[in-house]
Amino acid sequence: MFNKVEADIDGKLISIETGKLAKQASGSIVISCGGTVVLVTVVGAKTSNPNVDFLPLTIEYQEKFSAVGRVPGNYFRREIGRPSDQEVLTCRIIDRPLRPLFPEGYRSETQVIATVLSADQVNSPDVLALTGASAALSISHIPFAGPVAGGRIAYIDGKYVLNPTFAELESSSMDLMVACTRNAIVMVEGKADELSEDEILGAIFFAFENLQPLINLQDELQRANGLEKIVVESPVIDAELKAKVVEIAAAGMQKVYTTVDKLERGKVYDDLKKEVVAQLDTEEGLRASEISSLLSDFKKTYLREKTVNTGVRIGGRAWDEIRDISSETEYLPKTHGSALFTRGETQALVTATLGSERDKQRVETLNGETSRRFMLHYNFPPYCVGEARFLRGPSRRDIGHGTLATRGLEAVLPSEEDFPYAIRVVSEILESNGSSSMASVCGGSMAMMDAGVPLKRPVSGIAMGLIKEGEGVAILSDILGDEDHLGDMDFKVVGTCDGITALQMDIKIDGVSRDIMSNALDQAKRGRMHILEEMSKGIAEARAEVVEHAPKYFIHKISQDKIRDIIGPGGKIIKELSAQYDAKIEVDDSGLVKMFVANGALAEALVERVKSITAEVEVGAVYTGKVKTIKDFGAFVEILPGTDGLVHISELALERVKDVTDVVNEGDTIEVKVLDVDNRGRIRLSRKALLG
């Protein structure tokens, strides 16, 4: 049955309809705002998959170029291959708030596909896709504890703006994505221009209050068009077996809790599991998996309660204690900049490389082709967690972590006018036990300063966690991998001494109040300040100049009518200069010549050569030139690179000359004076004028 519901959200009409498109899907909706239209479908298998012990949920997001009336620019002229980074990031934005809302034990294959059908290049489709995914799940048979509403928050002239246009975002000091249910914030992600904790917190709860109409809209649609939800039976727990597991494992779990080293802690737990299974597995392996599951549940409960009740975390740290930090720069001799950053058992080796305008990343989006001057690539090889597996391309997680670090560092980059290099930062995670993306931020900041990038201020990042047991709340700084897995919140904050530049928050439970979030932000700030202080021991400020083996940058302004001289016919001159001086040379339409020279020793020579090629010929000036061509009526002399003038036979000598070659020959170097430049640019020279 076709149905359409609408709501005015902060002055913008958002509509959700169902019953017209993709009716064979388990749930299908079309959500629109202005001229932006997104189709979201969800399909869930009717039966559970017995071969998996996790939620088999897949999220896909597709941007069709037909949505903006364009043909893809690739050879095949169609959308092919892997999704773009933007599509991957939107998949993650949709996935993270939805995944915790499926019931435990739901094991049916489920796929959500969001397709951008029309884009007006004013209203962003990603926020619509998030809300649309929730709406499609809500009307399907799939069990889902939603609905969820998503929105983007801007901060313009001291005011929060919900779902700003692309033009409004250009003048905003914040770009924050927020997702919420009726009762709680469930996801936050975005960047800011060094804003305060209070300004960030205000944005989050501004979104929560103003997104409630979208929750109501989905409830209305679900009441009218929703299918009956399937019931997921909760697994029956053998209370007697559970009690035995707890009794046998209690003493050993304390050893797990107090073991500091990650690998050793894992070994202690594995030994404990073998012991418990050996004592209780009396049915030839039939109950081993059940015993392991009960032991895992006990571990989670034990570690959570121990942390909240004792004020001491896994490994013995206090709630706000940061692991030991060490850092150094200039670790790699031939990179432009490098830093080794280690925090506990998390280690990142980060490099910074400087490039020219041509090294910018070209990106084709629905809003047109753009270029990225700053790139940060995050790599997470299997050995960093002691595993062996095939090396693939970057995963969705890699892209997401790299983007978070990118956002955190972008706010402190110098302007392109002050520092015209393209910058590529690569973070290789060598060890991982929590917050490797934040190690990438710290290492990236240090590597760029080591390369001579004049950052406005150093940047650090910290991963926070939360454990809420009854009335007890533990806010944890610099969380471990185990604390991330067992906790109720993963909250990453990036910033400088002046404010927050990026953050990412995933909350798994209801009931995280504004006070708890405020306390978490304040505790994160104290942690960031401590980390910045530790980083300053490795490098406190950027080098005064880029390193010797980095490309050197020079600019020279020429008149627009000289652009053709520096380029030459078919690009001949500029190609010759690039090859001779090992340089990248770019000339824009205004006459600005940008030169990136790989060998600093050749830089000044290139600049002088460019100046000579584009110099204006002055009447009355004397030049030393080379005879290029001999004619019966005189000799053509090159007085500037690519600029020839004629010495008429009558201007070669004081006496009468019968044959030009009696005075000069091709290849001779002579001094000449400029007599005249006519309106066609022809230059008249004289040798005779210098002989009297």
UniProtKB/Swiss-Prot annotation:
Residue positions binding Mg(2+): 484, 490
Annotated ranges, domain KH: 551-614
Gene Ontology MF terms in the entry: 3'-5'-RNA exonuclease activity; magnesium ion binding; polyribonucleotide nucleotidyltransferase activity; RNA binding
One Gene Ontology term, aspect cellular component: cytosol
Gene Ontology process terms (BP): mRNA catabolic process; RNA processing
Catalytic activity from the UniProt record: RNA(n+1) + phosphate = RNA(n) + a ribonucleoside 5'-diphosphate
Gene3D superfamilies, A to Z: GHMP Kinase, N-terminal domain (3.30.230.70), K Homology domain, type 1 (3.30.1370.10), Nucleic acid-binding proteins (2.40.50.140)
Known role: Involved in mRNA degradation. Catalyzes the phosphorolysis of single-stranded polyribonucleotides processively in the 3'- to 5'-direction.
NCBIfam families reported in the protein's UniProt record: polynuc_phos (TIGR03591), PRK11824.1 (NF008805)
Protein name per its UniProtKB record: Polyribonucleotide nucleotidyltransferase
Annotated gene: pnp
